[in-house]
Regions:
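Sec-dependent signal peptide recognition
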Residues: 2-9
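Formylglycine-dependent sulfatase
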Residues: 12, 17-392, 407-428
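Short beta-strand-initiation
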Residues: 5, 334-336, 396
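Long, contiguous interaction/recruitment modules in multidomain scaffold/adaptor proteins
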Residues: 404-461
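Structural detector for internal amphipathic alpha-helices that build alpha-solenoid repeat scaffolds
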Residues: 468-485, 501-519, 531, 539-553, ...
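Amphipathic alpha-helical scaffolding segments comprising HEAT/armadillo-like alpha-solenoid repeats
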Residues: 484-496, 516-533, 554-566, 586-599, ...
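C-terminal substrate/ligand-recognition segments
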Residues: 396-410, 437, 464-482, 508
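…; additionally, a secondary subgroup of soluble metalloenzymes is captured
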Residues: 21-24, 496, 509
Length: 630
């Protein structure tokens, strides 16, 4: 090789190294199930010296929120930059099919030359596409990257997951390195929706303990960067996947479930237009759906146009958000469709199933000490107004909170004339979002599965060219179901709509007002619902059966529910089991069928355990037993 060629190769090699060095490494430190209960966020009970110091080196965001109050739907939104309700990943432990254009954002990072690792939680609710990560397992680490590549690395801390509070063994394992003074937390106050008892105070103290353990883990990960001499080359993002892992927080859309810590440290060389100044506190509204687009923007990669998240750091960022949005759908074995909109001050909630109690019996939280304590004081009728509020049998159709004056969201302002303008504004923001994002949560789950099998993805159900104005009709039908007896005639008319999802909401609405349907409309309603018992859609049949049971036509409706239990698809069976639990004593004639179906089935998600859980609960209530299932 002559000297000229050697020099040329050296120049090219140096150029490659400079290119890699010129782009930031990006490190995510994620944890589970905590709200911003860190000392740097103003909580003196927290022992978080490492995160407090980290916040002084970066930007602490005070208004960061997730898109759901539980991990898997949130994580699907974070990794794709798409609302879970747009791509069909909103139901807990579902399995959505993605359209070809939607992929984990790491695909574009890897194409741009980044080495991408994940250690190690995925939990995306869809099959992870090949090529998403260079490595994704418990040994994945940025240290193993090729020397000429920048990295994007994710480490997840699971020690503060709700299981760390509920399981004595896990709690001891997670906190075994803490000194006695680290555990010496004096819980001065509790959220007003919890009973003030020693057990609840102990659980809240444990919550602070696992946060302290997590803080030490953060220190270890930051120290690794320092030791490698990469702190000045690496943007570090710390976040939690949702709020506190305790009742009325996890799985819920109150700030206790949606509000999360977010701290970003940007080395000086990567700061743009004053972004990322050390010690800065930002009240900009951020949704964690924005994390993926932000990483791409910081890495110099074009953000795909289909992404719904908005980059909040890097060059040419879009205008800050006016609102963040959240969605609750099926949580394990229980359906409860709720939507949330929040600005910097107000929170709006739309309860699409207000006739379901707040605390539906759900296996996992009911095993926790705090939920058991709530049930204990409920049985004794020894409850404060704050606790009683969330034990009411039904919910309001709409909720509105001034989070500045009422941070625990205890005082619903939706009926207060002084806040009528705010209610109207926030309600419209929700309705607009349903249309703009094509909210699949309004499509019953069994119907989603059937349609995505034909169309290739859940996204296509409301977004393919043939969908037309289905989302508009769906939004209106779901809203109509909440309008009470005055809307009975319109609901009956809607029973004859062409699309099953619209018929479904008409059945739901009539079931909600079953005993209040105007006398002049009762016969028409009963006849229309009886026709729906033979509908081709499982969800329509189940919803019609529910309505007829509440109209005292259980003799005709129960065989339909049993048929779905016996031979229906997985999520239709869960739906039918929930209706049998709801109608309580009316289900006595089919106890034998319920017992027959309280069995695990091979080939279903988790062997159909959600149907088993609901039927077990219903049978315990009917027979006065206390049987348990996994």
């Amino acid at each position: 090789m002559n000297l000229r060629n050697l020099i040329l190769l050296l120049i090219l090699a140096i150029g490659d190294v400079s290119s890699a060095a010129g782009r930031p490494n990006i490190l995510w430190l994620s944890c589970e199930d905590i709200s911003p209960h860190l000392q740097c966020y103003g909580y003196p009970n927290a022992t978080t010296p490492n995160l407090d110091a980290f916040a002084k080196e970066g930007v602490r965001y005070t208004h960061a929120f997730v898109t759901a109050g539980v991990c898997a739907p949130c994580r699907s939104a974070i990794i794709t930059g798409m609302y879970q309700t747009s791509i069909g990943t909103q139901h807990m432990r579902c399995s959505a099919k993605l359209p070809d254009h939607v992929r984990p954002f790491t695909k574009w990072l890897r194409e741009a030359g980044y080495y991408c690792t994940n250690n190690s939680k995925q939990d995306y609710q869809f099959k992870t596409p090949s090529g998403t990560w260079d490595v994704s397992n418990a040994k994945a680490h940025w240290k193993n990257r090729p020397k000429d590549k920048p990295f994007f690395a994710v480490f997840n801390y699971g020690g503060c997951h709700e299981s760390g509070l509920a399981s004595e063994g896990k709690y001891k394992t997670v906190t075994k390195g803490l000194k006695p003074h680290d555990r010496d937390v004096v819980v001065k106050s509790l959220p007003p929706y919890y009973p003030d008892t020693p057990i609840v105070r102990d659980d809240w103290g444990r919550y602070y303990d696992v946060i302290t353990a997590m803080d030490r883990w953060v220190a270890e990960k930051l120290e690794e960067l320092d030791e490698a001499g990469l702190a000045d080359d690496t943007i570090v993002v710390y976040w939690s996947d949702h709020g506190v892992g305790l009742p009325r927080a996890k799985r819920w859309l109150y700030d206790s479930g949606m509000h999360v810590p977010l701290i970003v440290r940007v080395p000086e060389k990567f700061r743009i237009d004053g972004q990322g100044k050390p010690g800065q506190v930002s009240d900009q509204l951020v949704s964690l759906i924005d994390l993926g687009p932000t990483v791409l923007n910081l890495a110099g990669v074009k953000v795909p146009s289909h992404m719904q998240g908005l980059a909040f750091l890097g060059p040419k960022t879009p205008s800050p958000r006016d609102y963040v949005y959240g969605a609750r759908d099926r949580m394990d074995e229980r359906y409860d469709i709720i939507r949330a909109v929040r600005d910097r001050r107000f929170k709006y909630l739309r309860n699409y199933e207000p006739f379901k109690t707040y605390y539906q019996y759900m296996n996992t939280p009911e095993k926790g000490r705090l939920m058991r304590e709530i049930r204990r004081v409920e049985a004794l009728s020894d409850i404060s107004p704050g606790v009683a509020r969330f034990l009411e049998p039904i919910k309001a159709k709409e909720e509105l909170y001034d989070t500045d004056a009422d941070p625990h969201e205890m005082h619903n302002l939706a009926a207060d004339p002084m806040f009528a303008a705010e209610l109207k504004r926030m309600r419209q923001a929700h309705l607009d979002w349903v249309l703009q994002t094509r909210d699949l949560g309004l499509v019953p789950e069994a119907e989603i599965n059937a349609r995505q099998a034909k169309l290739g993805s859940a996204w296509a159900i409301l977004s393919n060219p043939d969908a037309g104005d289905l989302i508009s009709k769906l939004r209106d039908a779901a809203s109509l179901s909440l309008d009470g007896p005055k809307a009975a005639a319109k609901m009956i008319e809607t029973l004859h709509e062409e699309d099953a999802t619209i018929r479904y909401w008409a059945c739901v609405g009539l079931g909600n007002i079953a005993r209040e349907i105007p006398t002049s409309q009762k016969d028409k309603a009963a006849i229309g619902l009886q026709v729906c018992l033979k509908d081709k859609s499982e969800n329509v049949r189940v919803a019609a059966a529910r309505a007829l049971c509440h109209m005292d036509f259980a003799e005709e409706a129960l065989p339909v529910l049993v048929e779905v239990l016996d031979d229906g698809t997985q999520w239709a069976r869960v739906h039918a089991a929930n209706v049998l639990d709801e109608i309580n004593a009316q289900a006595r004639p089919v106890i034998a069928a319920m017992k027959r179906n309280k069995a695990y089935r091979k080939g279903l998600v988790a062997e159909g355990k959600y149907t088993v859980r609901v039927l077990n609960r219903a049978l315990n209530e009917l027979e006065g037993t206390n049987n348990t299932v996994k």
